A protein has these predicted regions:
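Alpha-helical scaffolding within the catalytic cores
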Residues: 47-53, 82-85, 174-178
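A glycine-rich, often tryptophan-bearing local segment used as a flexible ligand/cofactor-contacting loop or short
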Residues: 69, 74-150
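Structural motif
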Residues: 60-70, 98, 189-191
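Solvent-exposed loop/turn segments at secondary-structure junctions
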Residues: 5-8, 67-71, 103-107, 195-198
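Non-catalytic C-terminal accessory domains or segments of carbohydrate-active enzymes
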Residues: 1-4, 97-99, 108, 195, ...
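Aromatic-Pro/Gly-enriched surface loop or interdomain linker
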Residues: 1-59, 219, 223
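The substrate-binding groove and active-site-proximal loops of carbohydrate-active enzymes
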Residues: 12-23, 40, 64-80, 195-196
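Catalytic beta-strand/loop cores that center a nucleophilic Ser/Cys/Thr
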Residues: 124-188, 193-203, 216-223
């Protein structure tokens, strides 16, 4: 889910013939991993969401990847109640969502991550410094991390991400959340701060998608 949809399918994190960029590689790895994963992938724009109330029918998991206030994650598109309601409703009714970087990032109505309540994490931008933040315990035994043989490589990662009270943190470093999971209604959300391409990270994304879709039992179908 981004501002381009099909217009930049498979190229939405590519810069100048996919040359390495420090600002980009932590997100490009998601596209790289998806390209070899056993999933059907559709590229959906925010205009698609507005134009067709059924555009998410048949979708199991949404993925929103990139820095806040960019076309990658949507920026001001999240001010549209129809967009926010469509995505929240999709997850609440049983869909999955994987957010990487600053998904739905846009300062508006007291939140930076507009899907904070869905993802279970928020970014500290100075407005919530006085909020108590007691949730820092890690849960490394989660399904998503079972293939990892070493600490997860988040690339550049993200600064200032904290978990809401009912969120399960998988990885935090120096009290900055790098990976977390959260239930929202009947649905599931996964937050990852960055995902440069590697074999292990491709497994992390694979497992994140299966878990968020309530489909862990399919893990060994294409092992």
């Amino acid at each position: 889910l981004n501002c381009w949809g099909k217009m930049r399918a498979w190229g939405c994190h590519m810069v100048h013939h996919a040359l390495y960029q420090k600002q980009n590689y932590s997100y490009a790895g998601v596209i790289e991993a998806l390209s070899g994963a056993p999933f059907d992938v559709r590229f959906i724009s925010f205009d698609d969401l507005r134009a067709d109330a059924h555009v998410l029918d048949g979708v199991d998991v949404l993925i929103n990847v990139g820095d806040g206030d960019t076309a990658h994650t949507g920026g001001g598109e999240w001010e549209d109640p129809a967009v926010a309601a469509a995505v929240r409703g999709f997850v609440y009714n049983g869909g999955g969502i994987v957010g990487v970087g600053e998904p739905s990032g846009h300062q508006y109505e007291g939140h930076y991550l507009q899907l904070a309540g869905v993802l279970g994490v928020e970014k500290e931008t100075g407005f919530t410094l006085g909020y108590d933040k007691y949730n820092w315990d890690e849960h490394p035994g989660h399904f998503i991390l079972e293939d990892c043989t070493k600490p997860v490589d988040f690339g550049e990662g993200k600064k200032g991400i904290y978990a809401l009270p009912d969120t399960e943190i998988l990885v935090q470093r120096e009290k900055e959340v790098q990976m977390a999971v959260h239930a929202f209604g009947k649905g599931r959300a996964v937050y990852i701060s960055g995902l440069p391409y590697s074999f292990e990270n491709s497994r992390v994304l694979y497992r994140s998608i299966l878990w968020s879709a309530h489909d862990e039992e399919s893990l060994h179908k294409w092992f």
